[in-house]
């Protein structure tokens, strides 16, 4: 099971990466430095193409089109559409694009869509492109991935928006809304279902109860009755809905409530080409409907009904009506819709179908009739009404004229229209009843504390023919776009305020206000005018259109068409739309004959009676905000109705305005989230994108409008550390990290402005508190600079790599050349020896040596063989004993090696564990650092909260003091008024005390003036403080939520650290156990374990520290909660105080007029104080400016110092590299010199060997001449080697020249880069030094070659002085003595030859006699030599016919034994003595024997020389 879970988890992770994460191929170096731009095309498949910008002077730019044509245009945001660098391909949030324009947005969407990624953020938007195929991105495992994750931590997804809304609702305790808009077929309904699926999964009960099933299953019922096939969508929702998902205080889902808008009832009676009626009509006619029920309802097949067979479209691809009907019945069961209600629903649907088949005929031009009444009777029976009454209501309805009812005959078209109105009313009210039923089952208002609303409504519609329905939809989207603009850019500008970015607040929410007023504003808006014309008896569509032209001719959003006088145009935010006013008044009235309405109210079927109950419809008498939430918002073509206050005519326009006002009121009370759905193509093909279609939808959905407004702000932003880490390489000497990232980023931007003023503009950059902000396109320009810098780096790296590969190939070729020359030299030496006359003479003379007493020698040899056999047996015994001992020693060695290997493995394991612990420790340190930063931020946030609390307490105290002071002032003011009057009387009576009284009065008047001013300020401050307290309370609540979230993160980190701690303790215990077992001889491992233990203790101390910080965070959270409660109490007190202040305000305002004259005197003082404050502010600004200049100067000096240090480091590194290069070249030259010396030394050795082998032979003079010739040839070879060395020296010089040329080329290519030029000069100087070193090495080589020449001359003279054979033997003995040490060293290798000697045992027995006489330490070598001599003698005795084969065999044997013979001094001496005895004892054959011995000696020495070579 665990394996299955792991495998399943891996598959889920794979699906997440494959279908939700963009697979970036990494950095790609641009092929060129061309500047590209987007250019509009006339191609139907491509809206834009890439063009090259050939000229750009800042004001105008020139581009080269694909056909080679060049065009110039002024450079502005409209004309110049920049192409983003590859780094921005496939970004998850299009708000991050460097160039924010239409083609850039389209290109990014296409990139992601091609990779099966159809979710993309665009600022606050989530853009969802319909994939037209099933992908595994909505599974329960994917839900678990997004559960509780922040939006920026996971890939874009509808689940991420849903989770963000849910978490925001719980944290802020504010209702949320999710606005899903788009054209039909874009996927609005599917995304709505995914939102419900996600919220039900994360907020429902773990085991999944009935309510969760009901929430998931009520949608199929709405789809059956409200969805239909259209040309764009097989399951198009023909109504808008707002689903209110309800939650309790704990965040558990408790129910749902649905509001509907704009039901397309006209589809019941007529459909467009290739479209169907609502699904329910086909489902009840499918094979899933029981046959007995079909017979009861008189149903047959779709082809038999007029409302279904108008377009002969009865089926839908990939949809089985029978299965969908079964699914709907299952949903009925889950929602507890009983059999009686189901039957009533099916009866109503069947009655509509039968009413559609009524056979109307013309009785005359003014009267219609029925051909037969079969269908009429069936419909009347199903509706529970009389057939006669139904017929009269359809053909001759009654109207009220005064106090009398008058019957009015209808012709065929009007009778059919009356029938259609009845069918639409029946279906519309049936749909309302179903929605109300679902709401009664799902809604639990008594348990509801919060809710999330999901709005599924059509986006902006611009068709070829636009009517009243399109105006209502576009009017809705104007309101929603205004709502979005206000919300989006209020948040955006709050971000600027937090980051202290200079910004003038702009209310973008008013951009659509003119268009909205044109449509809705009373009394002359389009909809009020339509209502006015609707109630006029003589009004028609033409009079309505004329009224529009008269009223709005000069309105900036209203246009008059050039051709059609019955149409008008409105300029919406998404574009200009032309509306046809045909049948607008009729649609606004949506008439239903009173006779038919009353007939249905009196139906015998209770269900039908309930459909026409006025309580089914919402009342519009009161304002929407005052109304209780209606179960449904109405329909697209709402019929007239009666208000509860009496007869009241309600138009569709009025009704819809009220519904929309109610919707906007609900949305305004929520925090909204926006999802925009897009159709990629009209063919419903996966992987295909129609550029113009997508652009039109982006425009209609407000995405491009949002981008337009975003250009006015600072859409691109990065944190300082992120920006520095990515772009530090654009400034020499900059590092990816800095203690002050903001200052480092400022320096980097200043450097870019100075270096690239045409690409980086200081007016396009703003520095915030924690982030750097850019205008649209500025960040893309910086990214281009970065790519250019990386391109140069990559080119340099490639050049270095190619140079390294070329040098390695050159070295390999040179080694191959040297090896080939050595082989050629050895082959030439062998051929020279083979063709040497003396060697040929030796080969021919060898078989002619005189015979000796071989029988005696054979007997002696046999005797020696027996003795040697005994010795061999003894040696075998000794060898066997040694073999046993060796085997035991090998076994012990193997055991020791195994133990050593095991010990090494354990040590490696311990080292690996140490490395793992070190990594864990590093991770812990990083986590601790992150937690410390979070705790610091939390502490600062807590401090801010405390500071706000203190300020609020101070303000509260001041407010209370102000109020108390105000009360005292009021009383004092009344008393002062009385005193002033009494004093005035006293002044009139007592004129003599005028001076003293005047001073007292003046002082009191000043007091009164001050009190008046303070009173006015108190009144203003009271209002300001009230608003401030509210905003601060909200901010405090948000801060508390943030602290709560941070506390959750810290708690999770704590749990993770505890797990890590436990894991470390277990690993430490294991390590200690291993160390105890191998304590002996493993002190190093023990010390490592101690170090790991120390690290664990450090980790524990860090965990304890984190625990203390966590407790501090919990305390701060508790403090924040207490502050929140205090603020609530303060707000309540403030409300009470404000009520008192309002009461006092009215009394004080009466007194203001009396004291205004006294306030005038204080204005002068206020102006003086303001002037003084301005002066102080100027001084402060000057001081700040000087301080900033000083800081900038210090930073500049520090930067120069760093640059100097970097240059010194670079120079040092270059110098070391050149030194290493020179040393390498010197080693190569020394190696070459050694080769030359060995070659020169081999030449004299060969010559010396030749001269010693031909002593006492005839033609000694010719031999000496031959040796001289050989020496001369060796000298020529040495001179040839000297020429080769000179050639190599010339090659080195050529390489130096090539390097100089490369440097010159590098200087030419990079003349603008001073640093590269300096490096090239330094490299050239170093190579010149290397060249001088090479020259000196060459001179030393020439000197050594001269020395070698002298040695050759000296050895040649020595050879010429050699006159007798004795001297030659003595020199040979001296040479052999010099080789004795080498022989002794090689004897130690005899043990390795034991196995070979055993295989050659028979051959060794024949060599024992010869090796015993020699008495050499190397018994094996002497035995081999004797065996060679014995074989040689036996071959001579056997047959002369085998002469050639014997010679070849001897030659091979001699060649094999040359190396060994060269190393055996005593054996050669014995052989020389033996040959001398043979020469002395056999006079008759002395010449032949001597020549044979000399020849064999020459062969031995020649073979030795070749072996050395």
From Swiss-Prot:
Tell me the ranges covered by the Myosin N-terminal SH3-like domain, including all copies: 32-85
Q: Which family does it belong to?
A: Belongs to the TRAFAC class myosin-kinesin ATPase superfamily. Myosin family.
- Species assigned in the record: Acanthamoeba castellanii (Amoeba)
Region listing for Nonhelical tailpiece, in residue ranges: 1483-1509
Alpha-helical tailpiece (LMM): annotated segments: 1253-1482
Q: Region Actin-binding: which residues?
A: 660-682, 766-780
Residues recorded as bearing Phosphoserine in the entry: 1489, 1494, 1499
Assembly and interactions? Myosin II heavy chain is two-headed. It self-assembles into filaments. Hexamer of 2 heavy chain subunits (MHC), 2 alkali light chain subunits (MLC) and 2 regulatory light chain subunits (MLC-2).
Name of the protein: Myosin-2 heavy chain, non muscle
- Pfam family for this entry, one: Myosin_head
Any Gene Ontology biological process:
actin filament organization
In this chain, composition skew of type Polar residues spans: 1231-1240
Functional summary from the UniProt entry: Myosin is a protein that binds to F-actin and has ATPase activity that is activated by F-actin.
Domain Myosin motor spans what residues? 89-787
